């Protein structure tokens, strides 16, 4: 079901809108918002259960809920459960100013949320459990993640890659294979988070030869286990004094930091919040 116009689909807590399988053995396809005419859409109190993906007019939809080339869209009180066949539960590409609040995603086939080539994506109060791959996968995007729980992913809690800029605030990232991955000229700022009980809490590295550097991670007011971090030579790790005391590895730390107060994360262009790496070099 592809929507090429503005959608206002608003259920209620007692009577949510539900998309589910009519045949338990056969997955349905995708619900997609496509192109600028679908800007300013609102989806609220909706459950998506057992979908997959699809294609139309040469456009491939790799998730059961897809946002393609839209802006100023609100998703609130959404559940996505048990997608199959296609990789993602929720996919955003070529999007801007998207607000996802109070989202629950369980048992995604691969990535729970995949965000590509998008800017100013706000993710607030997410619960993502048991992802088949990553909880959140980012490519060349700017994203703010707040007040969320990302747990039991078979691969990464957050994978920030290919030039992405990401702020993660007040979020629990636990019991994943890798908690945070920063790679390929991406920067991730981690503020007031709990990142623990992952097989590896943080990995910063190069993967794609087209990018000159590895990944960059900046910790503010966070506890991190130095035995659970891997940082390649072309990556950067920096911390404020609170985090530094808990890490105890002075030779790996940047000499200076720009610090943002958590309140400054609200109502801002995300790229404007992030760190200018030239100031560390």
Question: What do these predicted regions represent?
Answer:
Residues 1-281:
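Beta-strand/loop edge motif enriched in small/polar residues
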């Amino acid at each position: 079901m592809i929507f090429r116009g503005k959608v206002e689909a608003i259920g209620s807590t007692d009577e949510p809108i539900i998309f589910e399988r009519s045949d338990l053995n056969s997955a349905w396809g995708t619900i997609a918002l496509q192109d600028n005419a679908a800007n300013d859409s609102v989806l609220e109190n909706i459950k998506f259960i057992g979908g997959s993906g699809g294609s139309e007019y040469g456009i491939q939809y790799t998730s059961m809920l897809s946002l393609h080339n839209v802006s100023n869209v609100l998703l609130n009180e959404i559940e996505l459960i048990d997608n199959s066949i296609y990789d993602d539960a929720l996919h955003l590409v070529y999007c801007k100013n998207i607000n996802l609040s109070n989202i629950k995603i369980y048992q995604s086939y691969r990535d729970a949320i995949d965000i590509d080539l998008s800017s100013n994506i706000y993710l607030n109060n997410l619960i993502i459990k048991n992802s088949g791959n990553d909880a959140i996968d980012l490519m060349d995007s700017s994203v703010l993640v707040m007040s969320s729980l990302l747990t039991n992913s078979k691969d990464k809690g957050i994978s920030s890659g290919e030039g992405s800029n990401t702020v993660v605030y007040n979020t629990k990232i636990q019991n994943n294979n890798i908690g945070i991955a920063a790679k390929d000229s991406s920067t991730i700022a981690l503020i007031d988070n709990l990142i623990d009980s992952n097989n590896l809490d943080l990995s910063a590295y190069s993967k794609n030869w087209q990018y000159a550097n590895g990944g960059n991670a900046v910790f503010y007011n966070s506890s991190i286990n130095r035995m659970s971090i891997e940082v390649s030579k072309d990556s950067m790790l920096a911390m404020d004094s609170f985090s530094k005391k808990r890490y105890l590895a002075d030779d790996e730390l940047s000499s200076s930091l720009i610090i943002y107060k958590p309140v400054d994360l609200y109502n801002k262009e995300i790229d404007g919040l992030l760190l200018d790496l030239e100031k560390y070099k």
